[in-house]
């Protein structure tokens, strides 16, 4: 048995900010995917995934039935029979590994599910987001529900604020454009929960809160607007500012060995780096006006282009 594929995602803008009502923009990333599967001879990895699913089933039994109900016994017996999530999405990389799993489970086992084929009103999108937030919180404490939403619908999503989200049309790519958004592999697995904990601790300080509002959220919102309008010039100006703010105020989320590289981008204007997801490792997002220059400048690292300007 093998179920339909669910894809990874990239939160282009809005990491951390969306916890505090900044704008955000999330796009599907079809390079990685996952599907529910059962094998005759499962690998170690499949068995590990199966164990995790079995704990997930217990968690889903306790979810508020007013919110969502599942074919829970069917799910439990499928898991009992060895079902696992077969995924190429790297875990701890900020591209939504648990989100795709949540989307796959909802798709297959939820009652009265909202589907991508119907007219997706704001209410329906929000309801899905709340359901997914509840489901995904099993994996890392506090989830916004956005990753599974993106994976489930496989369309770009614009977050205007916590309770105002909509599907978005993003400008068509210029396939031979020199400008690019890319992923840089840090080679380190990042853990989401401790990073979110650091952020929440910082939020207790007045100075950090006002920096978030006056700098981080301001530039994040501007980046989202620029990207959707296709205003590349302004986008790079704002991305540079955002990159600076992150370097100055989100240092623990940037792996130590990337601090200099981060600074170099800002100083040379060859590329600007930002967090991809919660940081701490995994992928780092990069924006450049000239991908060849960026590749040269970052030649010791593996870059994957995800969007061309």
Predicted regions and their residues:
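Glycine-rich, charge-dense phosphate/pyrophosphate-binding loop(s)
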Residues: 15, 19, 217-309
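Conserved hydrophobic/aromatic beta-strand scaffold that supports enzyme active sites
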Residues: 3, 9, 148, 156-158, ...
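Alpha/beta catalytic cores of group-transfer enzymes, especially the acyltransferase/condensing modules
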Residues: 123-169
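Acyltransferase
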Residues: 169-224
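ATP-binding N-lobe of GHMP and related small-molecule kinases
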Residues: 1-95, 107-123, 272-275, 280, ...
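Short, well-structured alpha-helical segments that form the helix of a local strand-helix-strand
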Residues: 122-138, 232-242, 295
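Buried hydrophobic packing segments
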Residues: 101-113, 149, 284
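Phosphate-binding site recognition
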Residues: 98
